[in-house]
A protein has these predicted regions:
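Extended, subdomain-level signal for the structured scaffold at the beginning of enzyme domains
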Residues: 9-127, 140-151, 159-209
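Short, thiol/selenol-centered motifs that function as redox-active sites or metal-ligating centers
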Residues: 134-137
Length: 209
């Protein structure tokens, strides 16, 4: 399928075998950029994205956190926007989705305690479906037990969790991403261009101009 569009006077062509149906797992205090940017980007290229949170419904919101790099030894944290969910968690049937997106921030810390969430992550990996995780999203991958023998990027503070889960931590720049089979990972939001470009490639979406 080809969707032409004009941007800055240039004709862009977005090619994909078909529009994909994607699931995004979010929770309270997910990172602001890492939630909204992939959500809007994937919608913009023609995919369907269902953003869900355990025990919440479409129209409910999650609070987000803004993580920034301001010269301290770790990231700073501020209150972000409210992000509105567009699908009921209870209605999620993983077999009907083509890919999974996991933002970082605080949310993965508690989402990994929910066996329903871990089962969703395992389904996508066992089915070989594309999974995109950024920053602390790797905590869900580790808790789901899907990193054995895999190479995974994450926020550097998550490197011990990646290794303890049997994975190899990809030591890449904060603006870079890494693809290992169906798994596309990155250290933080500065990597969004590389991370989303690699995820779109794994999904089979091409943008030409």
């Amino acid at each position: 399928m080809t969707r032409p569009a004009r941007y800055g006077g240039r004709l862009l062509s977005m090619e994909t075998t078909m529009s994909k149906k994607l699931l995004m797992l979010v929770g309270d205090y997910a990172e602001d950029y890492e939630t909204m940017v992939p959500f809007q980007t994937l919608l913009a290229v023609g995919h369907t994205v269902h953003a869900v949170c355990p025990d919440k419904k479409a129209g409910d919101t999650v609070a987000t956190a803004i993580h920034d790099f301001e010269g301290a030894q770790t990231y700073s944290e501020k209150r972000g926007h409210n992000f509105t969910l567009n699908h009921d968690f209870a209605k999620v049937e993983p077999q009907h989705y083509d890919g999974l997106v996991i933002p970082g921030g605080r949310a993965p810390e508690y989402l990994r305690l929910d066996e329903r969430v871990l089962d969703i992550v395992r389904h996508f990996d066992q089915a070989g479906k594309p999974i995109a995780a950024v920053c602390h999203g790797a905590q869900l991958l580790a808790a789901a037990g899907i990193l054995q023998g895999r190479t995974c990027s994450a926020y550097p503070a998550c490197a011990p969790e990646v290794r303890l889960a049997g994975g190899t931590y990809a030591e890449i720049g904060i603006d870079q991403a890494h693809t290992d089979g169906n798994l596309v990972t990155a250290p933080a939001w500065p990597a969004h261009p590389a991370w989303l470009a690699q995820f779109l490639a794994v999904l089979g979406t091409r943008i030409s101009h």
